[in-house]
């Protein structure tokens, strides 16, 4: 188990006295489970430019390419397993409310289900989920583990109008009002495995600081928003996240 550089005593006390915690997770937490990040691939996803597979315009221009791409990603994600960072956050999610009735909310930018499979219950997907589809005819979002390339009928309305339930570039992330309300009610904001480059998620730490929350960054390397955090600890998520959870619950 990795040992974290000791926190300032006043910050450690403030963390332990927190009641509600909001944790933002990004691609870095799932990378160690074998899910490639867009930025680590030199601006390519499976050799595709983001403009070709992750925008509404791309879907309108070449829906077959987009559907094949997401079918491949959906299949691949189902072969991956949660790593120690996911398991540690699930433990925190279970045990923290027992202390003072507080709550942990995991707000993830990731579209995999590794937090849930790791045992976390309070997870909010702001960028959608690979294992959901979105029907453009009836606006339902059914669970979906198969393929979409053959235009299967929606299980709700029977129309062949399903697309990936993913927030593409240029679209509005999901449940932002809930996220801001949770940050406003929290005492501690933690960012794990994020680049600090994708908004509005990247702006949450600034909101947290302006509201007076304690802020902590756990990342492989410093992010574009590191200056906004009270404390930063660097290292692989699978090592530093369990170490932090051990300290917080200890």
List the predicted regions and their residue ranges:
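Conserved catalytic core of sirtuin-type NAD+-dependent deacylases
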Residues: 2-250
């Amino acid at each position: 188990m990795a040992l974290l550089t000791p926190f300032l005593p006043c910050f450690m006390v403030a963390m332990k006295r927190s009641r509600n915690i909001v944790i933002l997770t990004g691609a870095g937490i799932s990378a160690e489970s074998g899910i490639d990040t867009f930025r680590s691939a030199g601006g390519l996803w499976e050799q595709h430019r983001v403009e070709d597979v992750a925008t509404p315009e791309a879907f309108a221009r070449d829906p077959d390419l987009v559907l094949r791409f997401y079918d491949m990603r959906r299949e691949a994600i189902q072969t991956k397993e949660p790593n120690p960072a996911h398991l540690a956050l699930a433990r925190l999610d279970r045990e923290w409310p027992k202390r003072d009735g507080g709550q942990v909310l995991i707000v993830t930018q990731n579209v995999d289900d590794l937090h849930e499979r790791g045992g976390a219950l309070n997870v909010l997907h702001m960028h959608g989920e690979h294992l959901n589809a979105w029907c453009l005819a009836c606006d339902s979002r059914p669970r979906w583990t198969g393929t979409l390339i053959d235009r299967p009928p929606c299980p709700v309305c029977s129309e062949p109008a399903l697309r990936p339930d993913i927030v593409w570039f240029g679209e509005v992330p999901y449940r932002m009002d809930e996220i801001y309300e949770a940050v406003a009610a929290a005492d501690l904001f933690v960012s794990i495995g994020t680049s600090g480059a994708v908004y509005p998620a990247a702006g949450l730490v600034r909101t947290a600081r302006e509201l007076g929350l304690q802020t902590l960054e756990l990342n492989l390397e410093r992010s574009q928003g590191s200056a906004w955090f009270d404390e930063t600890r660097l290292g692989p998520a699978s090592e530093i996240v369990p170490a932090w959870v051990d300290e917080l619950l200890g």
